[in-house]
Amino acid sequence: MNYQEIENKLIPLRDYEKSCREIYLANPEAFRHVVWNWEDFKEQFRRTDTSGYVLGEKAPVFMGNVLTEQDCFPDENMECSIIIHDRYAPPFYHNLKFIKVVYALKGRCRFFAQGKTQDRECLLEEGDFVIVPPEMNQAVFTWEEDAVTVNIILKRSTFGEAFYSLLLENDSISDFFWQMLY
């Protein structure tokens, strides 16, 4: 399978993405701010809604606050997992117990990080990526139908082994990775 064939398989919306798109199109304003869970999103949606759209009791996608290695690695021998980010899913903060690389494979997405004093937001254009350390509250929002945002999930131990020589350097990049791992 070549690159174009792979991309073509990733573009069609999955059923739950279609549900999220319907909600987004009813009230895009509700997606402008990051929430913590479905209840927070429903409240935000109600405050900004002019469409009369009625949200369901349950979220159409997973909106848990903590993701562990066990959640993303069904086989404990796996070192890396690649997960396509759900398009149109409400941006919600969640904490990771592993390292994640958010990669804008096609189109754009927004990345949010919760800081100690101020939240940060950045636009990732096609080809951009961000490395997310463990224990960081973060969120991603992909709102373009033909966009593909990829989450590359790495175990802490795998990252340390793969970048061992970089960790031995004495510079700001190695300091960042040391802090991320330990």
Predicted features by range, described:
Residues L96-I99, N137, D146-T149:
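Extracellular structured ligand-interaction cores
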